Curated annotation (Swiss-Prot):
Induction and repression of expression: By bacterial infection.
Name of a matching Pfam family: Antimicrobial_6
Protein's recorded name: Spodomicin
Primary residence: secreted
The entry's keywords: Antibiotic, Antimicrobial, Disulfide bond, Fungicide, Immunity, Innate immunity, Secreted
Example of a GO cellular component annotation carried by this entry: extracellular region
Function: Fungicide.
Record PTM: Contains three disulfide bonds.
BP terms from Gene Ontology: defense response to bacterium; defense response to fungus; innate immune response; killing of cells of another organism
InterPro entries from the UniProt entry: Diapausin_sf (IPR038203)
Family indicated by similarity: Belongs to the diapausin family.
Subunit-structure text: Monomer.
Annotated source species: Spodoptera littoralis
Length: 40
Protein backbone atom coordinates (compact mmCIF):
# COMPACT_ATOMS: atom_id res chain seq x y z
CA UNK A 1 0.00 0.00 0.00
CA UNK A 2 1.40 3.39 -0.94
CA UNK A 3 1.64 5.70 2.08
CA UNK A 4 2.30 9.23 0.88
CA UNK A 5 3.37 10.77 4.21
CA UNK A 6 6.17 8.18 4.41
CA UNK A 7 7.66 9.01 1.00
CA UNK A 8 10.07 11.42 2.66
CA UNK A 9 11.74 8.67 4.69
CA UNK A 10 12.53 6.47 1.69
CA UNK A 11 16.18 7.48 1.80
CA UNK A 12 16.56 6.70 5.50
CA UNK A 13 17.45 3.49 7.32
CA UNK A 14 15.02 0.58 7.34
CA UNK A 15 13.97 0.90 11.02
CA UNK A 16 12.80 4.46 10.34
CA UNK A 17 10.80 3.29 7.34
CA UNK A 18 9.14 0.58 9.46
CA UNK A 19 8.41 3.12 12.18
CA UNK A 20 6.65 5.44 9.74
CA UNK A 21 4.54 2.61 8.36
CA UNK A 22 3.58 1.48 11.86
CA UNK A 23 2.62 5.05 12.75
CA UNK A 24 0.08 4.90 9.93
CA UNK A 25 -1.40 1.59 11.00
CA UNK A 26 0.69 -0.83 8.94
CA UNK A 27 3.08 -3.56 10.07
CA UNK A 28 6.17 -2.35 8.24
CA UNK A 29 7.64 -1.22 4.95
CA UNK A 30 8.07 -3.44 1.94
CA UNK A 31 9.96 -1.19 -0.47
CA UNK A 32 10.37 2.21 -2.07
CA UNK A 33 9.63 2.47 -5.77
CA UNK A 34 10.68 5.77 -7.34
CA UNK A 35 10.36 7.55 -4.00
CA UNK A 36 6.99 6.03 -3.14
CA UNK A 37 6.89 4.25 0.20
CA UNK A 38 5.09 0.92 0.13
CA UNK A 39 3.83 -0.38 3.47
CA UNK A 40 2.18 -3.69 4.28
Amino acid sequence: VHVGPCDQVCSRIDPEKDECCRAHGYRGHSSCYYGRMECY
